[in-house]
Amino acid sequence: MNKISRRNFIRASALSALGAAAAGALSGCSNNAASSAAASSVASSAAASEQPAAAASSITWDDIFATSYSQANRGSNPDAKAPETPEEYIEQKGNGDIMGSMMVGMVDSLNIPEEQFMNNKPAWLGDEPQLADKVEYTKDCEVLVIGAGQAGTAAALRCAEEGLNTICCEVQTWEEYDNYACDLTTYNSKFFLDKGAEKYDPMDIFTEYMVKALGHANQKIVKDYATRSGEALDWMLAELDPDYVAKYAHAVNYKGNKHFQNPCSHSYYYVGMTQWRDTGTDTNTNNNMWPYTVRLLQQKAVEKGCEYIYGAQGLTLVHENGKVTGAIFTDIDGKYFQVNADAVIVAAGDFGGNPDMRLDLCDTLRNLAWSYGKDRTDVNNVSSMGRDGSGIRMMLWAGATMEAGPRAGQAAGINSRPSFPFGGIWPIFGNDGKRFFNETITRHGSVGYLDMMPEGQKMVCVTDSNWDAYCEYQAYDHQAMERSNDYMLEKVRKDMANYKTGPDGFSVQAFARYGNDPTTLYAADTLEELADIMGYEGDAKQGFLDEVKHWNEMCDAGYDSDWGADASMMHFKIQDPPFFAASSVTGGNPSGGLCQHAAVCTDGEYRVLTGAKAPIPGLYAVGNCCGQRYGIQYHTPTAGNSCGSAFVTGYLAAEYVKNDLDNGIGGGENGSEERTTNGPVSYTHLTLPTKRIV
């Protein structure tokens, strides 16, 4: 099999995943953490079924060590400087493009022979390396957190706050640290309720979530998220400077949408997404501010006594007699060191950036390539984005097991429909000028139909001069503007008011994406002129004009007899000039999607399980290292769920870990002893920023 470079892979993955007008899908779906350690498949237990025995592998540990661990942001830029203020961060980010952030965690393929996939011990996993003799120095703590993304940072901060002697190891350096998460969804937070947002019954959210997960998700994890995520957000915001929160934290759609609770999406939608953007400020870069916010939370953890070690690549867990008592790392200088701990929380992210793990583990991606007539054994045809899977690998070596399939990727096989810069759901017309699907079944995670369209399928999205009023019926989702942000709304209104008719189009600020890149729209005074601009000719042009007339008749009747669009969309008549269109065509390639959510099984309190579904003492998994958070697809009640869920798992896992240690349950020495929890423990306080924090 051929190797695929990190750069080519992430470019192909992102573009195919998002479609022509949907780069905004990246904005809400973070994966967990930019960190080290772990990933992947099967684990030795009774659950390892009737797969063929592993073939003799030509892949060695040296091969894996040299290839399968991400080196991004690990000293690759000696001139890097950690931003010390939001202004420095915004200047470094430039135009707000997050493609560079997405590179973190990508690794190359090992070129594993086809026959060495789909085994109980796949070649990418191999035998656990024995590294104890290589260790040059050790550290001791009560709680070790591996990975400092949203899940790991939340876990480390709360553990330190609870008086636990905590060390957090992160693979990136402090100067280069980055991640591509952004929108953060929680429910019933004081932050939202104080602004006048509706208070929900958390059991309604829980039930809706489980319906979308098709019963596949761990109900305890989902219930905790539905009932306690608002608490987690308020806790986090209290750690930050109020002026910073007021400037960069936007409570999405808490106002300005009269019909928001009956969105045109054939499913209920819950308000609760906090979006971190530099929007409506003196700079107005529209940059994603969440990575900088995570930096601030890491500094807060240090102030509370947590020791951060940056540039630390996790390699193996220390485990014996079924208990986990620490982990072995390499530092930024290549030295091996060991951290001993009573509890280890693995928050190292997914395996989406590892081509070999992705090909072997992600059923949906592999078979998606096959359905396009492509070689499903070629990593070039199974794209995604994300981390290197090292954390999952570590846990599998220690006896963990992966969740069962189908292990769908986040939005794998889910192409995006075209939309306007202000996002939302609109009538869409195809090559013959006719509508060809139900546009309201286009929630992120539910549009696999578009991915099956042949190359060159025209998708023309149309509205009229009433576009602003129609926006009141739109749920946020990933390709919609945040209507509670007055700056966004007024900027788009200004751009739309300055429209120009004709084939050259005009530019509108694309607030459905990050950065200041505009989107080209087209305007015309008549539908006939709009059809010409969109390339409709002959029968196709007449088909378009007839279909618009038919659409308006169905709107008058309040019922879509053709495709069953949600009734709330039947307000969107196309009758008052000027008329506007956005257009794209399908590329004939499968959408690789975003990160991978499949991971190891836990018991609902984040204790990692063996194949016999018994907890491994001392081992916990959060964020995208924690499996069974979703169904066979990332289909959720609110955009920004991935990042929000990851953060909440870290927040709650810290609580469960403290309870376990207080009750003598753990992998290390203190796990079997009575702990003294009264009074502060002794910490080594650290100064930020440094070359690397050790």
Ranges and model annotations:
Residues 75-121, 226-335, 355-356, 548, ...:
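Conserved redox-cofactor binding core of oxidoreductases
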Residues 1-20, 24:
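N-terminal secretory signal peptides and thylakoid transit peptides that target proteins
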Residues 99-107, 316, 537, 541-629, ...:
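A glycine-rich dinucleotide-binding beta-alpha-beta segment and adjacent secondary-structure elements
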Residues 12-19, 31-34, 48-141:
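Extreme N-terminal leader/targeting segments of oxidoreductases
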Residues 683-690:
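Conserved small/polar residues in nucleotide/adenosyl-binding loops
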Residues 392-394, 398-536:
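An anion/pyrophosphate-binding glycine-rich loop and adjacent beta-alpha core
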Residues 340-413, 637-639, 643-652:
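Glycine-rich loop(s) and the adjacent beta-strand/alpha-helix scaffold that form part
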Residues 139-141, 334-343:
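Core beta-strand elements of the Rossmann-like FAD/NAD(P) dinucleotide-binding domain
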